[in-house]
Amino acid sequence: MAGHSQFKNIMHRKGRQDAMRSKIFSKLAREITVAAKQGSPDPAMNPRLRLAVQNAKAQSMPKDNIERAIKKASGSDVENYDEVRYEGYGPGGVAVIVEALTDNRNRTASNIRAAFTKSGGALGETGSVSFMFNRIGEIIYKPEAGTTDNIMDAAIEAGAEDVQSEETGHHIICTFEDIGEVSKMLEAKLGEAESIKTVWKATTLTPVDEEKALSILRLISTLEEDDDVQNVYANFDVSDEILAKLSA
């Protein structure tokens, strides 16, 4: 089982749902504000903002929160956020990419470096691991959104590149550049998605045992708890047997 979305599900079952939701909304609001500040405050005229709003809606973020985040961009006291990508190796040689929006690069770099070091890994230079990933668009629908055939037909018509239907939902893959248009066309056919985002998909996987999997889980959790961190991606591969143990 590749990636760490399954581990996110495990973490959410540990009784931290409310705290996680609050943090997710905070990160979504930051992305909306940055997108609105960089372009038009009208989602119809700003592709990045439109995608950010779509994703916020997919995460059930209240409409008032979304509008407040957009309005914040026009304020004179709004912080200036830099988009920064950090790369390094975690436990077991697992490649990790961290995306952040920060108003203090020194603080964020220090926190992320400390997290890597504590886990037994090491923060590297930009480009040190990203060659093992592809930048893609990923749109996720719940299982009840439609049959496999219906989802496939809608995805093909929208210009998607691949569809992976599982018990947990339908994962629709498209190019990084086309995610805005593809998600818009899918919404017209299938309704609002559960998740719309650009992701780093691993092309090279690193198998890990149970001990290393737990260490990676702790590293990812620590990174995602940082307010500046927007997304974390890792290229580990864990067996279904180990995943079942961690889910127990």
From Swiss-Prot:
Superkingdom of the source species: Bacteria
Gene3D superfamilies listed in its UniProt record: 1.10.10.200, 3.30.70.980
Keyword annotations: Cytoplasm, DNA-binding, Transcription, Transcription regulation
Compartments, as annotated in UniProt: Cytoplasm
GO MF terms, alphabetically ordered: DNA binding
GO CC annotation terms, alphabetical: cytosol
Family indicated by similarity: Belongs to the TACO1 family.
Name of the protein: Probable transcriptional regulatory protein BH14810
